[in-house]
Amino acid sequence: MRSEDEALRGANMQRFQHDGVEIAFLDEGEGDPIVLVHGFASTAEVNWVYPGWVATLTKAGRRVIALDNRGHGASSKLYDPAAYHSARMAEDLRALLDHLDLARADVMGYSMGARITAFFALAYPARLRRAVFGGLGIHLVDGVGLPESIADALEAPSLADVTDSVGRTFRAFAEQTKSDLEALAACIRGSHQTLTREEVTRIRAPVLIAVGSKDVVAGSARELAALLPSGRAFEIPRRDHMLAVGDKAFKAAVLRFLAGQP
């Protein structure tokens, strides 16, 4: 049963069922479709609506579809880490395209959403036109990234009990977004899969990797781009992992990339 906060948050969202999970999503605008996949502890609203991405992309003539990942926002909450394997979350993305009868789409993910997008790109190359990996660079391959301490922080009795600085940041963010802390702890424990270098080279679609110049979570965009047959790196100036999301330079780079411009 959804909480009052979830009901209010999901009032304008559509829903469908997949893998026994209810997935909520926004669908706005007309034109070539782009699907937006948010990061850990975020939502479609927080990651894409509030920072102006939905408005920017619809104004550019795109149909914008943004889902709440399982365990997040108005979608179903699950408490088994195995339910959050990146490949299973990529299946939610594929099922969303099927539900909307979309043969292909552009896909943009941020942080965990970029990881999901990468798994989708590898599993369903025919369904992908172009991809944007925001807030995730070479750590997609080398496995460094969000630490296990985040799960401990989410399970702590209160924010005051969390001493780890990264854990405090994510606990505070999760509380701000009124997230289910237990579901998020399961998610962070279950979604840390990597791709091998060989698997990355099999992603043939054009990919833009955009990482903030002060991001200490994502890893190098240039190193990941060098592995991709059609990879392109973009450094978001003066931004860390959290502040890069709504950056104007990031938006401009994505619009150029989606339009096929250098």
Where are these regions (language model features)?
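Flexible "cap/lid" loop of the alpha/beta hydrolase fold
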Residues: R115-A123, R127-S158
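Catalytic histidine-centered segment of alpha/beta-hydrolase-like enzymes
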Residues: R239-K251
